[in-house]
Regions:
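Residues on the lipid-exposed face of transmembrane beta-strands in outer-membrane beta-barrel proteins
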Residues: 93, 100, 114, 155-161, ...
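C-terminal structural cap/anchor segments
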Residues: 418-421, 425-532, 536-537
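N-terminal periplasmic/intermembrane-space "pro-region" immediately following the signal or transit peptide
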Residues: 18-171, 410, 414, 426, ...
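Outer-membrane beta-barrel channel domains
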Residues: 37-40, 92-103, 128, 134-280, ...
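Membrane-embedded beta-strand positions of outer-membrane beta-barrel proteins
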Residues: 112-118, 175-179, 232-234, 268-270, ...
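Signature for the C-terminal beta-barrel architecture of outer-membrane proteins
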Residues: 226-228, 237-432, 494-496, 503-504, ...
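Short loop/turn motifs that connect adjacent beta-strands in outer-membrane beta-barrel proteins
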Residues: 82-112, 123-127, 162-175, 220-230, ...
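Predominantly the C-terminal beta-signal and adjacent terminal strand-loop region
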Residues: 421, 441, 550-591
């Protein structure tokens, strides 16, 4: 027989049914009921459990596990496998600087994080001419040279010491310290802007160290077997009132009680904060005074919010928020580090003012099926001792709404956005209807790649305030988002936008956004500029960004972005026909 024929016969024999190994027809399948404890999901009934042996072998004997079964700690398991420990490598073996094993004792862990955030930006936007001096003495216009370049470096360091388990149970104690080292270099075309003194020139270079976190967190108790808990946190701490930073996102000093219930389905925050004075140029907390009390503003925020997962839809989290802002900064004027008046704002009557405003809000974030959805709505009410243009008490009544819906199509995510903030239609009456936040940092409509959100657009010729502040979406007419007071006599905003994210590769993402912007009401701008009419159409905000992650992680992130505002009639009424734009490069290195 040939070798080929033998191979064919062997293949046929291997493929034929192994009848000799089949169980006899009278062989039954033996099942053994299990009587011991059974793991089950909360709220689900316990069903009968049987083990059925189909291979003709005697079934294994089932029995309960012992009451206590010793399992080695994870760091001992990793060490026994022989992985090397290198402090500079956060991923290999046990790294004591990353909390992989105890730093001392049995359950004291230490964690260090270092982030270098470097940004270079070149931009052109409306820039006022200095009152006393100019780089172009022959110019007659109130709008000067638009060119601006800046380099900003932030070294964010974080040191955490905590006691307790590191998996399911919250730590018993946590001590956190977050110093940030800043260097800023700015060069403008005009004098009298980097500093109020025009002899300071057109360039400013300086550094600053801010404390963005310094707190202790004490775990008070566990309230369920699934580690629902209550904790209290005291000190300088980060806080966000909602999902996207529309109302209040800051690092104030305060006390916060927080916790969870029903297997983390309910979450709550109850807190009282006093805001900290900021460094003018870096925006970081400034506690360089004699003690912390000198650095605290007479500006208090009381916050309560409640989260519920899977409400009203599976995968969608709802939140209700009640936030009160009490401001009593009317004693004396406040001059910022560059010599400019910040409180009260240099607009309208320019009188010191106080206010009490309460925000009642609903926020939601999650998905409904394949549709990703974020919504936010606030109603602000209260009173202020004097309005911006009237030296008399005014009642605050204003609203805000934002929504962003998106859907994934394979490697593409398409987005649609709408934002509405009410404006004041009569700046001389006894009502303030323009919505303003406490300290916003919105993550919507392109966020800081959007021109209108990223840039400080000054109201030239109507007071030393900005139509739209830096990293802010609201047209609030404030001199400074970080140091100024809220202003409820403003033109408001209407935004409608489309955008898309393209995950070209796991390392490369392309994002595009196009937003149409309008003022809600223009009466306050017309009063400030003594100019009428001013059209509502601000223009089209177009932005493009590329994000590259060479390690497919957040350790190295390079971002390039370009944005521009195509002027609408309202923008041209204020600033002329020039098209403002911004180009930036951002590099983040994280350890």
């Amino acid at each position: 027989m040939s070798v080929r024929a033998s191979s064919v016969l062997l293949a046929l024999w291997l493929a034929s049914p192994a009848t000799a190994q089949e169980p006899a027809a009278n062989d039954g399948i033996e099942c053994v009921p299990y009587e011991g404890p059974v793991r089950r999901r909360p709220g689900r009934p316990v069903l009968p459990v049987e083990y059925c042996e189909t291979e003709g072998l005697p079934p294994a004997v089932w029995g309960p596990l012992p009451e206590f079964a010793a399992v080695p700690d994870r760091w001992r398991i990793v060490s026994s496998l022989g992985y090397p420990e290198r402090l500079w490598d956060p991923y290999s073996g046990n790294n004591v600087l990353k909390g992989d094993r105890p730093a001392f004792g049995e359950d004291w862990f230490f964690f260090v994080s270092l982030i270098s955030d470097s940004t270079f930006e070149s931009r052109e936007l409306p820039t006022p001419v200095s009152i006393t001096s100019s780089t172009d003495p022959g110019a007659l216009d109130i709008i000067g040279g638009p060119g601006q370049t800046m380099f900003i470096e932030n070294l964010i360091t974080e040191f955490v010491l905590y006691k307790g388990d590191t998996v399911f149970k919250p730590p018993d104690y946590e001590f956190r310290f977050i110093p940030v080292f800043n260097y800023t270099s700015v060069e403008l075309d005009e004098r009298g802007l980097v500093k109020v003194d025009p002899t300071s020139g057109t360039t400013r270079r300086e550094g600053f160290v801010g404390i963005q976190g310094l707190f202790i967190d004490k775990h008070l108790r566990d309230v369920s077997e699934r580690y629902d808990f209550d904790s209290v946190r005291v000190g300088i701490q980060p806080i966000t009132a909602d999902f996207r930073g529309f109302l209040f996102q800051d690092s104030p000093f305060g006390i916060r009680l927080f916790g969870t219930r029903d297997n983390n389905r309910w979450q709550y925050n109850l807190a009282a904060f006093r805001r900290i004075e900021k460094d003018t140029n870096s925006g970081l907390n400034d506690i360089t005074e004699n003690d912390l009390s000198d650095a605290l503003r007479d500006d208090d925020v009381y916050l309560f919010n409640l989260y519920r997962q899977d409400l009203p839809f599976l995968g969608f989290t709802s939140q209700v928020a009640l936030v009160h802002n009490r401001n009593r900064e009317s004693d004396e004027p406040f001059i910022d580090d560059n010599g400019f008046l910040v409180r009260p704002a240099a607009i309208g009557t320019q009188r010191p003012r106080e206010y009490d405003v309460t925000y009642l809000g609903y926020n939601g974030d999650g998905h409904i099926g394949r549709l990703n959805l974020t919504v936010s709505a606030y109603y602000a009410f209260g009173d202020e001792s004097s309005a911006t243009f009237v030296d008399a008490q005014s009642d605050i009544s204003a609203g805000f709404f934002a929504a962003e819906a998106s859907r994934d199509f394979d490697w593409i995510r398409a987005r649609a956005t709408v934002v509405y903030a009410t404006g004041d239609d009569d700046p001389f009456d006894d009502e303030s209807n323009g919505f303003d936040a406490i300290f916003e940092n919105p993550l919507i409509a392109g966020a800081d790649t959007s021109f209108w959100i990223r840039q400080f657009v000054p109201l030239i010729g109507g007071g030393r305030v900005a139509v739209s502040g830096q990293n802010g979406i609201l047209n609030s007419l404030r001199p400074s988002k970080t140091q100024g007071q809220s202003n409820f006599t403003n033109p408001g905003l209407l935004l409608a936008g489309l955008g898309a994210d393209f995950d070209l590769t796991p390392k490369l993402r392309l994002s595009m956004n196009a937003n149409q912007l309008w003022f809600d009401k223009t009466a306050s701008i017309e009063a400030a500029r003594n100019q009428a009419p001013v059209a509502r159409d601000i223009g089209q905000d177009l932005s493009l960004s590329v994000i590259y992650r060479p390690l497919t992680s957040q350790n190295i992130v390079l971002r390039l972005a370009a944005s521009a505002l195509i002027p609408g009639q309202g923008y041209r009424d204020l600033y002329g026909d020039e098209t403002p734009f911004s180009l930036l490069a951002n590099l983040v290195l994280a350890y």
